[in-house]
Amino acid sequence: MSALRHVVCALSGGVDSAVAALLLRRRGYQVTGVFMKNWDSLDEQGICAADKDCEDAYKVCQILDIPFHQVSYVKEYWNDVFSDFLNEYEKGRTPNPDISCNKHIKFSCFHHYAVDNLGADAVATGHYARTSLEDEEVFEQKHTKRPDGLFRNRFEVRNPVKLLQAADSFKDQTFFLSQVSQDALRRTIFPLGELTKDFVKKIAAENRLHHVLQKKESMGICFIGKRNLEHFLLQVSVSDVSGGLLWAGAPVVMKPVFQYLQPRPGKFISIEDNRVLGTHKGWFLYTLGQRAKISGLSEPWYVVEKDGTKGDVLVAPRVDHPALYRDLLRTNRVHWIAEEPPAALVRDKMMECHFRFRHQMALVPCVLTLNQDGTVWVTAVKAVRGLALGQFAVFYKGEECLGSGKILRLGPSAYTLQKGKNRTRVAPEVSSDSPGLHPTS
């Protein structure tokens, strides 16, 4: 029966998705490979990286003897992912476009295309993750529309699928999948969930997939790649074409000629004595916890707060300065994957779990407090370094990824508390990373 199952596999032109398609083929499924083009630009040598990736994906399909399709979501990526990315940066937040891309593009646009246009019984990707469903259970799933209300009727989905961490904990990518919908997850297979990266490479080497095995692992912004972010945001521009803006052939309603973000020069100021240490091109380019490159200073200084009103970036010496540490945050309405929200959290209004706000960082024990609007307060058992507005707090209970929420408010830093400024109020939802620095955006 499994031989009749049609699985559409997303191919990126990399080794992980190639091996995912190979493993599906070995299971006897009818496999179709699809390459998504979501960004269109030339690299420094004038070569379009997306075209090279597309060629590599096509070659994978030739080797595996499976059909190949290409789809473009350039317009959707711009509207749903990149525009939000720019807006978040302008507000002084630290966005994660990889999480947004999975939510809006890979597990929405592509997912619907695979099911509605290609007749897929299931969709697959090369992510290192697992779900609580076996393959045959995935094929039996029916479409269930997500509820419009705040909380899902608990009888609506009797056996919700859970998102589980991969066997290879170092490569686990559930962090990036924490906003994926229940409906998409129910129809998804992750062939690499039980494998290590080394074993995946071994499979590729043994099956004539050398052209993807030799490629460097993709890093940086989803579909855009690893770039100098300051140069990318401030210098790259697009032009008016025939009276309307075209981005890779897709019309975009924006100013005819522009830079992504305009430079806004400001000062680096020491949080300890208010000394001006140097200047920068824009306060929004900096994330709490990162090292600030200040001309003329050899010793390291780190970003601890940002003042969007004045355009100043407050910095502190030492990588472990107390101004870098906080133990309290509030998210927007949390996207819960299996239960919305977890029964224990509804019952007790509080729940112990773990969270992380960066991929591959150690999980942090915390206590969640549920608010009536679906947002949560997150109290870390121990203060953590580098919390920033705009990041996603991703929650875990054992091996299960529960979901995530965007960080919109932060509690005072350990430095503020130590100085006796023990203000219990938390920063409003603004483009600042500490209380009281900015007016509301």
UniProtKB/Swiss-Prot annotation:
Disulfide bonds join 101-222. Keywords: ATP-binding, Disulfide bond, Mitochondrion, Nucleotide-binding, RNA-binding, Transferase, tRNA processing, tRNA-binding. Signal peptide: none annotated. One of its GO terms (biological process) is tRNA wobble position uridine thiolation. Its EC number is 2.8.1.14. The active site is at 101 (nucleophile), 222 (cysteine persulfide intermediate). It is found in: Mitochondrion. Residues 171-173, 358-359 are annotated as: Interaction with tRNA. It holds the Pfam family tRNA_Me_trans_M. SUPFAM superfamilies: Adenine nucleotide alpha hydrolases-like. It comes from the Eukaryota. The keyword DNA-binding does not apply. Catalyzes the 2-thiolation of uridine at the wobble position (U34) of mitochondrial tRNA(Lys), tRNA(Glu) and tRNA(Gln). Required for the formation of 5-taurinomethyl-2-thiouridine (tm5s2U) of mitochondrial tRNA(Lys), tRNA(Glu), and tRNA(Gln) at the wobble position. ATP is required to activate the C2 atom of the wobble base. PANTHER family: MITOCHONDRIAL TRNA-SPECIFIC 2-THIOURIDYLASE 1, TRNA 5-METHYLAMINOMETHYL-2-THIOURIDYLATE -METHYLTRANSFERASE. During the reaction, ATP is used to activate the C2 atom of U34 by adenylation. After this, the persulfide sulfur on the catalytic cysteine is transferred to the C2 atom of the wobble base (U34) of mitochondrial tRNA(Lys), tRNA(Glu) and tRNA(Gln). The reaction probably involves hydrogen sulfide that is generated from the persulfide intermediate and that acts as a nucleophile towards the activated C2 atom on U34. Subsequently, a transient disulfide bond is formed between the two active site cysteine residues. This is Mitochondrial tRNA-specific 2-thiouridylase 1. The lineage of its organism: Eukaryota, Metazoa, Chordata, Craniata, Vertebrata.
